[in-house]
Swiss-Prot record:
Residues 9-244 form the ATP-grasp domain. Substrate binds at N264, G321, I322, M323. SUPFAM superfamilies: Glutathione synthetase ATP-binding domain-like, Succinyl-CoA synthetase domains. It comes from Chlamydia caviae (strain ATCC VR-813 / DSM 19441 / 03DC25 / GPIC). Heterotetramer of two alpha and two beta subunits. GO terms for cellular component: cytosol; succinate-CoA ligase complex. The keyword ATP-binding applies. The gene is sucC. Its cofactor is Mg(2+). It is an enzyme of class 6 (ligase). The lineage of its organism: Bacteria, Pseudomonadati, Chlamydiota, Chlamydiia, Chlamydiales. This is Succinate--CoA ligase [ADP-forming] subunit beta.
Length: 388
């Protein structure tokens, strides 16, 4: 679960991490109140969306007067934000963050991440902050330092010394940096985060280390341990189908292909996506209905997949171990019989009550093609998806 910048900063403030004062506004009137509370004549106004690239895509405005700040608040709250991280979708802007300008002497990048290569949490740092870290990693890998962490939220003194030396922090900045890193690591572990990114972390001309921007992602599977974080979930920032899938308890991820997939089991679902790609096709979604879905849940899953206007072919791939193939068939038929414009459907059923399931579909008269081979089913689905 992604947090908005202001939510991430609220969390960091609770760990006594130094952040310039900020206020959040959802209207021009709230912007006026924010100006009074901050007592500033110039500042930065930033859209609050779950996407990066705000600065490059008009989502961040540097304002040099109170009237400019309010004009920026009004403008940004009216926009729908699009960047290369929104998958072509325009995200609504319901809040903006207002914060003072800072006298910056140096910018850094600092993050606590899940290092999948080494299978452990890690601190990642760079002396080049305020830029795309992916670009730095690709062009200047020597400017990045990755420090692995233990599973027990412990940061050793030698690791802190290694970081401080790499960042060239001296004097009082050494102490500030050491304390900041310890607090960020603690925050990461305490809240079951999968990402805690500070970009940029700045050194001011006054000699202070300040967090200017923060991005935090919480592990969805751990939210039951964090009810105060769970209520921060913002469904307006997600694909409508993703939100619906969560409400009905399905594991769904929207993709950009045209073959809608309904599969049981995450492993089989990923294999289905792979084999479609091998044969030149592209899935419109990942959808795992689970191992014991009911007829009602299958109906909801089919309706969810077909609600995507990009879906031109429906591919159902079920291995009925615990799952009843007849329930899958009944759920599919129930949805298809309510639709006027039916799309080609490829079905592969194996396992419990497979013959009954096939019979239910065949007697319904819906346009459906069966095959027992996963390879043949994928080839057929891809061929149908390219008929236009």
């Amino acid at each position: 679960m992604h947090l908005h910048e202001y939510q991430a900063k609220d969390l960091l403030v609770s760990y006594d991490i130094a952040i310039p004062p900020y206020r959040v506004a959802s209207s021009v009137e709230e912007g006026q109140q924010a100006l009074k509370e901050l007592a500033i004549d110039a500042g930065v106004v930033k859209v609050q969306v779950h996407a990066g690239g705000r600065g490059k895509n008009g989502g961040v405005v540097v304002a040099k007067s109170p009237s400019d700040i309010l004009a920026a608040v009004d403008k940004l709250l009216r926009m729908r934000f699009v960047s290369n991280q929104t998958s072509g979708e325009a995200l609504p802007v319901e809040k903006v963050l207002i914060t003072p300008l800072v006298n910056i002497a140096a910018e850094y990048y600092l993050a606590v991440i899940m290092d999948r290569k080494n299978r452990c949490p890690a601190i990642m740092l760079s002396k080049a902050g305020g830029v795309d870290i992916e670009e730095v990693a690709q062009k200047y890998p020597d400017q990045l330092l990755t420090v692995p962490l233990t599973p027990f939220a412990r940061l050793y003194n030698y690791q802190i010394r290694q970081i401080i030396k790499f960042m060239n922090w001296e004097g009082d900045i050494r102490k500030q940096g050491a304390q900041l890193i310890k607090k960020l690591v603690q925050c990461f572990y305490d809240n079951d985060a999968s990402l805690l990114e500070i970009n940029p972390l700045v050194l001011t001309q006054e000699g202070d280390l300040l967090v200017l921007d923060a991005k935090i992602t919480i592990d969805d599977n751990a939210l039951y341990r964090h009810p105060k974080l769970e209520v921060l979930y913002d469904p307006s920032q997600e694909n409508v189908r993703d939100v619906l899938a969560k409400q009905i308890g399905l594991s769904y991820i929207a993709l950009d292909g045209n073959i809608g997939c309904l599969v049981n089991g995450a492993g089989l679902a990923m294999s289905t996506l792979d084999i479609l790609k091998i044969h030149g096709g592209s899935a419109a979604n990942f959808l795992d209905v689970g191992g014991s879905a009911t007829e009602q849940q299958v109906q909801e899953a089919v309706s969810l997949v077909l609600s995507d206007e990009n879906v031109e072919v429906l591919f159902i791939n079920i291995f009925g171990g615990i799952m009843d193939c007849s329930a899958v068939a009944s759920g599919l038929v129930a949805v298809m019989q309510t639709r006027e414009n039916l799309i080609p459907t490829v079905v592969r059923l194996e396992g419990t009550n497979v013959d009954l399931g096939k019979d239910i579909v065949q007697r319904s008269g819906i346009p459906c093609q069966f095959t027992d081979s996963l390879n043949e089913a994928a080839q057929l689905a891809v061929a149908l998806s390219k008929q236009g």
